[in-house]
Structure formats: structure tokens, C-alpha cells
Amino acid sequence: MMNLTMTRKTVSLLSSLAAALTIGAIGLPAHAAIALDRTRVIFDGDQKTVSLNISNQNKQLPYLAQGWIEDDRGNKIQSPFTVLPPVQRVEPGKPSQVKIQSLPAARQLPQDRETLYYFNLREIPPRSNMPNTLQIALQTRIKM
């Protein structure tokens, strides 16, 4: 009888410990290697280009940064704006720039109100030489 009580207490203690570790792991924030210098982009109607500063926060590994524009429904678009360069390598701990350039079709947008687009920046990690490694590409999406 005493062994059964101790086993139940042990199982209860281990279950509580596992639950606490799981909850603690869920609460850990994900840190992006590629950081953007702002939370939104204001593209005034008379501007031709807007420069965004990005930086690789990882001090050991280079990352690729891929940028594109989406409309308000989340569809990837090629006009009236384009991202230059669409893909670039950012060295460890170094800054870089991404430019959003307006195309001639931008002149057809309404000038008396805002039009919503989204700027997306995806970080692509370098290929790992270790077997059985899970790599995650984080993406930042901000209003434009």
C-alpha cells in the first residue's frame, strides 16, 4: 500500500514538473536574426523610393533576407511597388538596406487617401551541416 502511495506521489510530481517545463518553454520568445528598423512604412505619394535598414543580429552566421510586397488580401504583387534587392546576403553582425521603389503604376493610386500594402521580410538561415536539424525561417510583416 505504501509503495502505491509513493508511486502516485512520484507520478504526480513528475507530471507537475513536466507541465511547468512545457509552459516555460512555450513562453520563450523567438528572436529573429534579421531585424528591421521600423514597424511600418509610410510611402508618400510623391516619393520614388523608401530605404529600410536591416541588420543581422546573429554574430556568427550569415543569413539571407528576402523581401516582397503583398496587397491588403495577402497576395504577392509585382506592381505598383517593388523591393530591391529581392534577396540579399547579410553578413554576421552587419547592417544592410532594402529599398521599396515605386513603379509608374503607383501614380494611378488614389492621392486623397491611403492604400494598404504589406512589406514582408523573411530571414533564411544558412544550411546546417549537422544531421537531423530543424531550421525555421522567420518572417516579419509590417503595414505599408
Predicted features by range, described:
Residues V50-N56, I100, Y117-R122:
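Buried hydrophobic-core signal for structured, non-transmembrane domains
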Residues G27-P29:
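N-terminal signal peptide c-region/cleavage motif recognized by signal peptidases
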Residues N75-R107:
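Intrinsically disordered, low-complexity Pro/Gly/Ser/Thr-rich segments with frequent PxxP/GP/PP motifs
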Residues A105-M144:
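Terminal connector regions
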Residues H31-S55:
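Beta-sheet-dominated interaction scaffolds and their linkers
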Residues N58-N75:
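Short acidic, flexible loop segments centered on an aromatic residue
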Residues M2-A18:
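Bacterial N-terminal signal peptides that target proteins for export
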Residues Q47-T49, P62, P95, E114-L116, ...:
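Extracytoplasmic
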